[in-house]
């Protein structure tokens, strides 16, 4: 993983989805023919994403620029295969073979990471456990709509508190695949959008699987950060449901220790960095880029930086309630 200075530069250059396209809602309040509850429909969505053979062409609205990508997914012999391909500009591929994900980019050497799924460009809610999230989120049916010439059911995923963002998802009535997701802030401003414009399913593994099986693996890259002993600082306040997933220790180019801890509630994530390096006071403050918030503050002669998918007010409270 990138060290903190590099990570901040990367995130500041990164883009996020924030514009809504063709957001017309049909005045059809009827629920799906199979009469699933909102929570059952969300569970059916995550199951369909993992168990069907399918291919999607979808659009990301990236800082006002639309980018089209193709995603293909298949199961064969109980192994997962997937491929994400850019359809505009320079061709880039991400290929999954079971628990290995390889990146192919003409500008850098190809490499492989150990992962259970491709995380790039896909909404994180596809990997969520909605039975667990029901304790902290409300799931509400919003009626029917039409996406990619398919009838869909709309469901709002809204936190029970006001410390997180919320989603509106559009789920295909027949296959239960996700065809659109809108990530919104507390005021309903669109931060991020995933929108399918064409898709197909198959009863058998898709043809791309055969070529993927023959493709040599690029070198495997491991996380070189250490899970070493960190300082005794702790977060005195967190929104309900968030818990620490891991912690690491590394050093920057100047030899300063950088401790990090990663937190998730199962839908949204953030990471806290505590560094011994001296930060310019002018760099304190917040930056929101799409759904990603960066909040920095100097405390106890240390740099504290939070990076994650949280409202600025929530990020500020978490950092300011940190205790050494």
PLM segments and residue spans:
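N-terminal leader/targeting segments and the immediate start of mature chains
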Residues: 2-11, 18, 22-79, 144, ...
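N-terminal mature ectodomain segment of secretory-pathway/periplasmic proteins
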Residues: 33-107, 137-145, 151, 158-166, ...
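Short amphipathic beta-strand/extended segments with alternating polar/hydrophobic composition
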Residues: 68-73, 94-98, 112-117, 193-196, ...
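Short, surface-exposed beta-strand-loop junctions and turns on beta-sheet-rich folds
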Residues: 88-90, 109-111, 186-187, 278-279, ...
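Acidic/charged, solvent-exposed loop-and-adjacent secondary-structure segments enriched in E/D, K/R, S/T
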Residues: 103-125
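Gly/Pro-enriched, hydrophobic low-complexity segments
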Residues: 148-214
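Short, solvent-exposed recognition patches
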Residues: 216-299, 313
């Amino acid at each position: 993983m990138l060290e903190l200075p590099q990570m901040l530069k990367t995130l500041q250059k990164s883009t996020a989805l924030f514009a809504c396209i063709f957001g017309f809602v049909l005045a059809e309040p009827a629920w799906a023919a199979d009469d699933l509850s909102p929570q059952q429909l969300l569970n059916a969505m995550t199951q369909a994403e993992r168990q069907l053979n399918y291919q999607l062409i979808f659009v990301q609205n990236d800082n006002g620029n639309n980018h089209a990508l193709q995603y293909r997914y298949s199961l064969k012999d109980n192994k997962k295969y997937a491929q994400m391909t850019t359809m505009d500009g320079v061709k880039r591929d991400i290929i999954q073979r079971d628990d290995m994900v390889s990146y192919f980019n003409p500008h850098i050497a190809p490499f492989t990471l150990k992962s259970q799924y491709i995380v790039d460009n896909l909404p994180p809610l596809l990997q969520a456990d909605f039975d667990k999230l029901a304790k902290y989120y409300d799931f509400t049916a919003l009626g029917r709509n039409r996406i990619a010439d398919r009838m869909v059911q709309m469901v709002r995923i809204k936190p029970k508190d006001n410390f997180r963002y919320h989603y509106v998802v559009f789920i295909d009535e027949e296959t239960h695949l996700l065809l659109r997701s809108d990530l919104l802030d507390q005021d309903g401003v669109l931060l991020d959008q995933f929108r399918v414009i064409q898709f197909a399913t198959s009863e058998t593994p898709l043809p791309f699987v055969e070529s993927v099986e023959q493709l040599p693996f690029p070198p495997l890259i491991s996380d070189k950060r250490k899970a070493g002993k960190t300082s005794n600082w702790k977060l005195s306040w967190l929104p309900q449901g968030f818990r620490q997933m891991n912690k690491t220790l590394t050093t920057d180019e100047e030899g300063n220790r950088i401790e990090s801890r990663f937190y998730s509630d199962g839908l949204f994530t953030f990471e806290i960095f505590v560094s011994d390096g001296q930060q310019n006071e002018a760099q304190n403050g917040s930056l929101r880029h799409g759904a990603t918030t960066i909040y920095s503050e100097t405390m106890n002669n240390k740099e504290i930086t939070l990076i994650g998918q949280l409202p600025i007010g929530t990020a500020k409270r978490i950092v300011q309630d940190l205790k050494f």
